[in-house]
Amino acid sequence: MPDSVDLSYAIGLKPAQAIEYFQSKGYTIGFNWHEVEVRAHATAFTVAGILRQDILQDVRAGLQDSLDNGLTLEQFRRQMTQKLTQKGWLADKAKLVADEDGVLEGKQLTPRRLRTIFETNMQSSYGAGRYAQQMENAADRPYWTRVAVMDLRTRPAHAALNGLTARYDDPIWQFAYPPDGWGCRCRVRARSQSDIDSKSISVWSSEGHLETVQQAWGPQDTREVQAFRYNGQLYTPDAGFGHNPGQGWLAGLGQRLMDRSVTAPPKMAALAVQHTLSEPQLLDAITSDMRRFVNQSLLREPAGAFRHAGALSTRTLDALASRGRMPDSAVLTVTDYAVVQSPGPLWELLPKQLRQPVAVAADGDDLLYVIRNGDALHQVRATPVDNAQGYALQLPDGGKSLTPASLQSLAELPLLEGSFDGL
């Protein structure tokens, strides 16, 4: 039988030391915690809602320090307040008018906003570990129960889901695995069949209860998102939190940041996406998620689902600006309609290849990317979307390899980035 542990001592340890401490007491860690820790660290600095490069770096450093050294919220906030005030990004709260999240005209931050960022991202970091552990143990504990804190801070919609129990492979966990909203403190408890039987717990299924709804997205836009009815009430995750987090926390956070980038100034969005996708763990997660999205899109009728694949580079934006064609949004998006029109393996390569294209040319308002797949070159067309929603990606000619004649035609277009020399 394992020895007793001193939780007051263990809670202040760094992750590696905490694991070693519990193992020394005879406890077996039933999941690959090294992998989970790496994912948690990668998750921690993918900060949604802060798209300015210098601030993103500061917040990343602060969150990393919090994970490494077990800093409290107050220590994190004090550290970030001093740093952001010095840079002129944090103003006197008494002199400003902020929205409910503390955001000031999209440019400045308040301590309340810092609290939201800290709690949401740390909760997501720990959620990555919980999810990995529960998936590895799904054969023994295949039933998941959603648990809310149930205090005065718990939102009624989240409190209403307290106790919801469904199988781990139920579709709702693809978009409603917590945290699924700003400030969400809910978690999931895994249960065995004997636990279900002994406690007479009812297992719910989302079959017949899933709906597609229009959700407000920014001040003047809406988008189709998934929702479900439970006990007669319709539940929808917060805007930006419905990107299949149950199958990839990092991919979900990456999609969330790019969602926010859609309405950000293009240069700011390009810097944020470029910086964030430089994290190998995140880029791999987004690539895997794109593969799943493509496979799922080919199994059903197109319904307007999409995945972001990246953003225009700052070099391309500068070239467009010099031509008087600065876009309203820099985000590049793959839709299920485009996948069905041109099925193939190229789609999953886009998150990586679009970051370092062979060349980018202008064709009117469209952009033509040339990317490499082994020894072959392929063309990707990016077409501006209405209402400043970035660019929709397509694979001309079904993604076939470019011929010498096709390359010659592309080389005659205005070059924005890269080179056609030697191709």
Please identify what each model-predicted range represents.
Residues 185-189:
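Extended alpha-helical oligomerization segments
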